[in-house]
């Protein structure tokens, strides 16, 4: 009987722990990255925000802010274009490999909301559900797709945004970057402050699937949550030399 009671207690304790963990896509705090796109700043970028309640919030990027409101059970669209504030030149990451200071988009709301992110131009379109900061992890594997060999602007890519200052990140890319600054399968470290984005793009025909990204502890500070996005600037699907294709754009799950 004692053994049976002990097993029941362990099961109940585990259930309570699982119930206490909130993995919902609803939240009050989000980090968005717009990774590189074959059309650069010409690309149109939009955020779609909804909630079952009325909500008020602020979008911040690159020192600019954009207040917004959400009516319950309706969708609010925030467009980041060259004619709005902030402009998409503040938000899109065009660095081949390197750090974009304050390129992370921070969304804060007074009420739980759901956020979707979209980047497009002409017939090319990519979108992702955005995970709230409370469910972000510290360790990720990248999924991507081969870029187009014959196009200099077609690259496999991933990007990392820090949610806190002094975030130390270790990265082991599955392929070298387009500038050959970071060899394949060799771990390197970067340090990011809150809102900074590190983007990594492959050479043509590259595929960064399998790249490993981990937030690590520093002296006197624990490892910190990060958001990771991946995809391609442009890919042809099923036919490597096709004349049409799409960018791929997805936030990674921890």
Model-derived features with residue positions:
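Bacterial Sec-dependent N-terminal signal peptides
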Residues: 1-24
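Extracellular lectin-like interaction modules
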Residues: 21-254
